[in-house]
Amino acid sequence: MAKQEQNIVYLYCDGACRGNPGPGGWGVLLRYNQHERQLHGGVANTTNNQMELTAAIEGLKSLKKPCQVVVTTDSQYLRRGITEWLPVWKRRGWRTSNKKPVKNQPLWETLEREVERHTIVWHWVKGHSGHAENEIADELANRGIDEVLKRGAR
């Protein structure tokens, strides 16, 4: 485990999809001081990007009060979307540079509300590159998919 500053929440999030669209899952690993919490869930029909957004939303929603948070994701869509593209999309009336509607707008709006509660630093790591906490978040996301598939098989 990497050295972590005290009184900062470290949030590692990941989304996964089997088929795109298809059954998907999200996973979150939270660390605060000596405490650790794992969250996951799944959806029967979704996309990988929707699950990436949902992971960040659910992780931030789980924090009971405003915090300093370091969010680590392997999704450039999530990191660049929240740090670079969101203000531009809003200025353009939720349109991309091609004048098309922004995909997943309701999720982006929900994420923005959650982000406003906290002081956040966003980090990107390459997926499946051996980053221990990101691998745990990935395992949790896949557990979310497995649970959806198990429910569907009943």
UniProtKB/Swiss-Prot annotation:
<keyword id="KW-0479">Metal-binding</keyword>
<comment type="function">
    <text>Endonuclease that specifically degrades the RNA of RNA-DNA hybrids.</text>
</comment>
<feature type="domain" description="RNase H type-1">
    <location>
        <begin position="5"/>
        <end position="146"/>
    </location>
</feature>
<dbReference type="GO" id="GO:0003676">
    <property type="term" value="F:nucleic acid binding"/>
</dbReference>
<keyword id="KW-0255">Endonuclease</keyword>
<keyword id="KW-0378">Hydrolase</keyword>
<dbReference type="InterPro" id="IPR012337">
    <property type="entry name" value="RNaseH-like_sf"/>
</dbReference>
<dbReference type="InterPro" id="IPR036397">
    <property type="entry name" value="RNaseH_sf"/>
</dbReference>
<comment type="subunit">
    <text>Monomer.</text>
</comment>
<dbReference type="GO" id="GO:0005737">
    <property type="term" value="C:cytoplasm"/>
</dbReference>
<feature type="binding site">
    <location>
        <position position="14"/>
    </location>
    <ligand>
        <name>Mg(2+) 2</name>
    </ligand>
</feature>
<dbReference type="Pfam" id="PF00075">
    <property type="entry name" value="RNase_H"/>
</dbReference>
<dbReference type="GO" id="GO:0043137">
    <property type="term" value="P:DNA replication, removal of RNA primer"/>
</dbReference>
<feature type="binding site">
    <location>
        <position position="74"/>
    </location>
    <ligand>
        <name>Mg(2+) 1</name>
    </ligand>
</feature>
<dbReference type="GO" id="GO:0004523">
    <property type="term" value="F:RNA-DNA hybrid ribonuclease activity"/>
</dbReference>
<dbReference type="GO" id="GO:0000287">
    <property type="term" value="F:magnesium ion binding"/>
</dbReference>
<feature type="binding site">
    <location>
        <position position="52"/>
    </location>
    <ligand>
        <name>Mg(2+) 1</name>
    </ligand>
</feature>
<comment type="similarity">
    <text>Belongs to the RNase H family.</text>
</comment>
<dbReference type="InterPro" id="IPR022892">
    <property type="entry name" value="RNaseHI"/>
</dbReference>
<keyword id="KW-0460">Magnesium</keyword>
<feature type="binding site">
    <location>
        <position position="14"/>
    </location>
    <ligand>
        <name>Mg(2+) 1</name>
    </ligand>
</feature>
<dbReference type="InterPro" id="IPR002156">
    <property type="entry name" value="RNaseH_domain"/>
</dbReference>
<feature type="binding site">
    <location>
        <position position="138"/>
    </location>
    <ligand>
        <name>Mg(2+) 2</name>
    </ligand>
</feature>
<keyword id="KW-0963">Cytoplasm</keyword>
<dbReference type="InterPro" id="IPR050092">
    <property type="entry name" value="RNase_H"/>
</dbReference>
<keyword id="KW-0540">Nuclease</keyword>
<protein>
    <recommendedName>
        <fullName>Ribonuclease H</fullName>
        <ecNumber>3.1.26.4</ecNumber>
    </recommendedName>
</protein>
